[in-house]
């Protein structure tokens, strides 16, 4: 089964860095995406806020250079997580994060 997602946007919540009891580092943040997409010959506004998690030692270097307001492209897969309130939420498990140059 295919499960791939690539999403660009702005980090809108402060990245939360944790280390699991087994020693695996995790970084969680929320990515806000806004764009105009074409559907059935019409332009429509696309918007979402997607929780993102990136795990593992090899991926943590990039997480220390991202902050609220950073523009990034995230590639990975999606999965459901159960929130503390018992509701399910979709989460993007990042395998790759690229900073988008703002041109400043």
Curated annotation (Swiss-Prot):
InterPro entries: NA-bd_OB-fold (IPR012340), Prisomal_replication_PriB (IPR023646)
Cellular compartments per GO CC: replisome
Domain SSB: 1-101
Keywords assigned by UniProt, alphabetized: DNA replication, DNA-binding, Primosome
Any GO BP annotation: DNA replication
Molecular function terms from GO: single-stranded DNA binding
Resulting phenotype, residue 44 to A: About 2-fold less binding to ssDNA, no change in dsDNA binding. Significantly decreased binding to ssDNA and dsDNA
Coiled-coil positions: none
UniProt record similarity statement: Belongs to the PriB family.
Free-text function comment from the UniProt entry: Involved in the restart of stalled replication forks, which reloads the replicative helicase on sites far from the origin of replication; the PriA-PriB pathway is the major replication restart pathway. During primosome assembly it facilitates complex formation between PriA and DnaT on DNA; stabilizes PriA on DNA. Stimulates the DNA unwinding activity of PriA helicase.
Known partners and oligomeric status: Homodimer. Interacts with DnaT. Interacts with PriA. Component of the replication restart primosome. Primosome assembly occurs via a 'hand-off' mechanism. PriA binds to replication forks, subsequently PriB then DnaT bind; DnaT then displaces ssDNA to generate the helicase loading substrate.
Protein name as catalogued: Replication restart protein PriB
Organism: Klebsiella pneumoniae subsp. pneumoniae (strain ATCC 700721 / MGH 78578)
